[in-house]
Amino acid sequence: MQLRAAAGGKKAPSLTPLSELGKGAADGVGWRVMLQKTLRYLAFLSAVLCLASAAWAGFRLEQVMSYSFPDHLVAAAKSGRVAWVSNQRGVRNLWVAEAPHFHAHPITHYTADDGQDIPALALTPDGSTAVYVRGTELFEDSGDVTNPTSNVHGAKHEVWAVDVAGGEPRLLGEINCAGEDCEDLQISPDGKSVAWAGKKQVWIAPVAGGKAAQQLAQVRGENVSPRWSPDGRCIALASRRGDHSFIGIYDFGRDSIVYLAPSVDRDSMPRWSPDGKLVAFVRQPGVERGLPLIPERPHPWAIWVADPTSGAGHELWHSGSTLNDSLPELTEDASFKFAAGNRVVFASEQDGWNHLYSISAAGGAPTLLTPGQFEVEDVTLSSDGRTVLYSSNQSDVDRRHLWRVPVEGGAPQALTRGETMEWKPVETADGRYVLCLGSTATTPAMPYLVTSTGRDMLGKDALPADFPSAQLVTPKQVVFPSADGLQIHGQLFVPRGRTRPGPALVWMHGGPIRQMMLGFHYMGYYHNAYAENQYLTNLGYVVLSVNYRMGIMYGRAFREAPHCGPKGAAEYQDIVAAAHYLQGLPIVDAHRIGLWGGSYGGLLTAMGLARDSDIFAAGVDFAGVHDWSVFVANLPGFRNAPDAEEARKQGWESSPDASVEHWQSPVLLIQGDDDPDVPFSQTVDLAQRLRANHVRFEQLVFPDEAHDMLLWRNWVAGYKATAEFFERMLKP
């Protein structure tokens, strides 16, 4: 082997052959000089080998989680400015960039990993001001805001504004809405006011501040989804009344609400036509009591249009009555648009795939915009409203790319392609630029400008210089059969240089309506998990990330597979199939396979240990569900359901708790005790059952922390504990 100069340009010292060491010994010093040169060379060789090893083998968890995760990318309606939320090591700030050069820079300067999320962002039409929310939604039962730092003054859920030109953020009011993703900021067409829903009413505040937020009107029910009319004179809203709901129009010049074609049904998602003459909305049947819980049944729906002045309306289109005709769960709200040319864009799964359609507001048959065996996810209109920009997995099933299609129909145009991933497209007001968020297998999510030849990263300085991209592996797409023949996709992470059998891990996402991809994920929770899987791979584990049935992007039949969840846990067979796949690899020791996951992935972790400790030697369970019967008993309509007790029994039998007497392998339980999604009591109860059955378990509890943990330092602590636990349980 010929050694070349090390990095930095220094020449390697010459090596004297051992046969020459005896020469010059007569002067009493020659051999010592030669020996010193040899030792220096060996030291140099050792340093070179260490540097080469570090270049691909060694990095810290903090390094691979040091990225500046971007989210909530938005574009101004009348300027070339875009904005997004950046979360770097738990410090969340707003960044902006502007056409044509898109030099990115922060406009807020928060400095602490304080657990204060920024779940919503909007720009005024001219792009001069950003309006955003800080804090998390209220617990519906207690009315509290998550306070993960245990601050003695508590935490708040507030709306703020900051001018892009500079200055300190100003408080506009409290939002205090309940429910995941309830933060819905709507800025008026003139950019002077912002409306939002909170405390069951709609509120309005001046963007300039100086005046307290005011309740828009006193309206019965829970009022959500405020939408400004194009002229700014009215606000449409959805008023939920329990078993029915209305679309109401608040006119700033009137003293009463106009309701659009009120009925016994449930109306939602109001959308104004570009000229303000019509409002489109979705109508579903009102709540029917006494229905059984176990059978699957269709959820038909219709699109209505109405005159916002008179309230008169009519049905524009209605779905069929099969399961595929149900209102799609994936993108029903985000895909519902009133576009240019008097056309309404909507999502439907009538052919078994989540696709976009459009229909003229004057009537007629809908047009399929996105044909094929793939699914659409992010959806937005172009600045002129004549085309739809969307992300999908078309032609690249385990990635996302961007596409464009005219609202009247035509061949979709691919905007991005290749071994990258893109999502959340936006277009500048002049229609010249498309921007998005994106990642690769080894580069974390960042904002990008889409070009004719690819994409250009914005805000490169936000990516830490020591981020270990060169040391990460590119996961391999794998497909394997489950016990019933269903084909399951996964991503296989293999340590570099791995040739002999060693430990392996199965990882399961939560949701379960999620899909993991061949790179850093678009959701913060899974972006973190992808980094942890890279870290575990770096420590010597083969990791298989499993897209089990019930996940998205493989068609409705896959997502809505029968006998899953509390109705039979059929999805668990996919996890066993993943273990069997690993057992068949020559680089995996079949006796040292563990599993880990969070939320639904935590449930499947517990299921694996409870049912198959002979397959899974250890597991880490982040906030998993352990007893489905508790959730079944809290379903709407449970009390009046004729099969209530049968459903509860079925839920119990589909749970890890039901098989705890077979549980033998050790487990690490991790959860925050202020979890709004999976009650902490699920972990408390499981721990008592494990104790009673003498099963070894360890625990890491974060007081006052949420389900999707808000503190970066808690993610790091949890992931370090995961790696250390597997090191003790699976390494020889």
Enumerate the language-model features and the residues they cover.
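Hydrophobic beta-strand positions that form the internal "hydrophobic ladder"
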Residues: 82, 130, 194, 232-235, ...
